Amino acid sequence: MSIDWFTFTAQVINFLVLVGLLRYFLYAPIVRAMQAREQKVTQCLTDAETAKVEANQQRMSLEKQTQLLQERREELLTKAKADADNERQRLIAEARKEADTRREHWTSTFERDQKDLADQTRRDIQRMGFQAARETVQQLADEDLQKRVCQTFVKQLQTLGEDQLAAIATQLADSGNPVLVRSAKGLDSSDQNQIRDAIHRVFENKVEVRFESEPALIAGIEMDAGGYSLPWNAERTLKTMEANVA
């Protein structure tokens, strides 16, 4: 069997041309498309991995933030509870202090009011007692009592010391006023003469003596000599007693 080298060569050339054409027009675009697709897939995979890494990082960041928030929340809750307890204790202490202050104030006010009431009651009782004593003495004051009062006054006058008498005499001389004798009731002539004579004996001169009635003296006599007062009466005694018990 003989070979037609021309035909063989032509077929080889045609095959090579066909391969070249296929490679240029068909295989090259397919390869480029496959490479582009591969690059795109690779890029997608890379992007996906990057997104996965970023997602993991975000997840970890969120978890960390969540943990921090939880810790902060617990810290805030603990602090808020402690602050609330402290405030409650402070309010309770203030309420107790206020209650104690009010109780002490009320107790003090009550005790003071009780004392004031007791003092006022005591003063009222004393006042009524002394008023009753005045009225009783006034009712019991008769002529015999008046004479005894005059006698007692004369004795009291005679017990004055020399210094007192000299001072009274000087005041009488300087003032030029008469000796004024006041009595709860008007003195009869004998009582007036008794007192006048006693005054003249004491002062050793004829000083003028005047007599006046003063019901407020209550069974007593009072002498005013140039500004010097010599009292002897129940009213003075009662006032002294009132001052002592006030």
Curated annotation (Swiss-Prot):
Keywords: ATP synthesis, Cell inner membrane, Cell membrane, CF(0), Hydrogen ion transport, Ion transport, Membrane, Transmembrane, Transmembrane helix, Transport. GO terms for molecular function: proton-transporting ATP synthase activity, rotational mechanism. InterPro entries: Alt_ATP_synth_F0_bsu, ATP_synth_b/b'su_bac/chlpt, ATP_synthase_B_chain, ATPase_OSCP/dsu. The chain crosses the membrane at residues 5-27. CDD domains: ATP-synt_Fo_b. One of its GO terms (cellular component) is proton-transporting ATP synthase complex. It is a single-pass membrane protein. Pfam families: ATP-synt_B (PF00430), OSCP (PF00213). Its main location: membrane. Coiled coil: none annotated. It is found in: Cell inner membrane. F(1)F(0) ATP synthase produces ATP from ADP in the presence of a proton or sodium gradient. F-type ATPases consist of two structural domains, F(1) containing the extramembraneous catalytic core and F(0) containing the membrane proton channel, linked together by a central stalk and a peripheral stalk. During catalysis, ATP synthesis in the catalytic domain of F(1) is coupled via a rotary mechanism of the central stalk subunits to proton translocation. F-type ATPases have 2 components, F(1) - the catalytic core - and F(0) - the membrane proton channel. F(1) has five subunits: alpha(3), beta(3), gamma(1), delta(1), epsilon(1). F(0) has three main subunits: a(1), b(2) and c(10-14). The alpha and beta chains form an alternating ring which encloses part of the gamma chain. F(1) is attached to F(0) by a central stalk formed by the gamma and epsilon chains, while a peripheral stalk is formed by the delta and b chains. HAMAP family: ATP_synth_b_bprime (MF_01398). PANTHER family: ATP SYNTHASE SUBUNIT B', CHLOROPLASTIC. Belongs to the ATPase B chain family. This is ATP synthase subunit b 1. The lineage of its organism: Bacteria, Pseudomonadati, Planctomycetota, Planctomycetia, Pirellulales.
